[in-house]
A protein has these predicted regions:
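Short, Lys/Arg-enriched, disordered terminal segments
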Residues: 1-7, 268-273
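Structured beta->alpha junctions
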Residues: 27, 43, 128, 249-250, ...
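Short, solvent-exposed loop/turn elements at beta->coil junctions and helix N-caps
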Residues: 221-224, 294-300
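Catalytic cores of DNA base-excision repair glycosylases
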Residues: 2-199, 203-217, 229, 287-289
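The catalytic Nudix box helix
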Residues: 256-298
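A short glycine-/small-residue-rich loop at the edge of a beta-strand within enzyme catalytic domains
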Residues: 192, 226, 267-271
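N-terminal strand-loop-strand
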Residues: 216-263
Length: 300
């Protein structure tokens, strides 16, 4: 069953996988790494444009490493999750200095780099260096869960290990990069989270979820993410044509980004804080100022 799955997948990839992406088939580890970091928490359609912008602006790791942090952050603007960008820049500097700009070709060395986890390390190792390491992302987990009829939660420790071992056992060790790309593309275009194309699926005869009517029930997730509400009040200080901004301190996801004066309150009944008024007075000096409020808005 496992061998047949792999054979059919590779056959589908060669004949029917028409998914096009600018990094697909790439063997340059720098470009593969860049694409994988951009695609973390980002849809392919959005990441495509940013990938091309980064490659055009920073053709090599040395180019990225030499760039000022503000320049890199500006190019990243709009993607969110700026920790990815910070790690990307830090790792580029490390590779430029430690490896003289040559991306490490050993899986464990790749995995040790800042901002790179098992999935990204496996992607780089298999796509760039043809090393036999299976990638396991949400697409892969979904395909495996449905095909084998597995109801172990994909986000549980035992589930993560189970899907990793299963993916490794299916891996075509002669062409791991092709297998990995095929698995991800199959999950993204055929075995989709919603409205999967079971009617054209080459695996449906052996797919346990299809045969037993479990498709909409798999995969299973253990955790339900709890949304946290935060209330921010921003103070936009204008003087003529100038606007005051400052670099954010601290170690949160927005560290080193620029912002207006910010006060975070415990509830939405926010009010002007005395310390904030003093801060504004320090900025504007003896000049007269007034505070005008605007309607609140929700950001999710």
């Amino acid at each position: 069953m496992k061998a047949e799955f792999t054979v059919k997948l590779i056959e589908w990839n060669g004949n029917n996988n028409h998914r096009s992406m600018p990094w697909k088939g790439e063997r340059n580890p720098y470009k593969i790494w860049l694409s994988e970091i951009i695609l973390q928490q980002t849809r392919v359609e959005q990441g495509w444009e940013y990938y091309l912008k980064f490659i055009n602006r920073f053709p090599t790791i040395h180019d990225l490493a030499k760039a000022p942090e503000e320049t890199v952050f500006k190019l990243w603007e709009g993607l969110g999750y700026y920790t990815r960008c910070k790690n990307l820049h830090a790792t580029a500097k490390f590779i430029s200095q430690t490896y003289l700009g040559k991306f490490p070709s050993n899986y464990n060395d790749i995995l040790s780099l800042k901002g790179i986890g098992p999935y990204t390390a496996a992607a780089i190792a298999s796509f760039a260096f043809n090393l036999p390491h299976a990638v396991v992302d949400g697409n892969v987990q979904r395909v495996l869960s449905r095909y084998f009829g597995i109801n172990t939660p994909i986000d549980s420790p035992s589930g993560k290990e189970l899907y990793r071992e299963l993916a490794e056992s299916l891996l075509d060790r002669e062409q791991p990069g092709i297998f990995n790309q095929a698995m991800m593309d199959f999950g993204a275009t055929i075995c989709k989270p919603r409205n999967p194309l079971c009617n054209v699926c080459i695996q449906r005869e052996d797919c346990q979820a299809f045969q037993h009517g479990w498709v909409t029930m798999l995969p299973v997730k253990e955790k339900i993410l709890q949304k946290k509400s935060r209330w921010f009040t921003y103070y936009i200080v204008r003087y003529g044509e100038q606007v005051y901004i400052r670099k954010r301190s601290g170690k949160d996801i927005w560290a080193n980004l620029f912002e207006f004066i910010l006060h975070e309150s415990e509830n939405e009944e926010s009010h002007v804080q005395a310390q904030t008024i003093k801060m504004i007075e320090k900025i504007v000096g003896d000049n007269f100022f007034k505070i005008e409020s605007i309607s609140p808005f929700l950001k999710q």
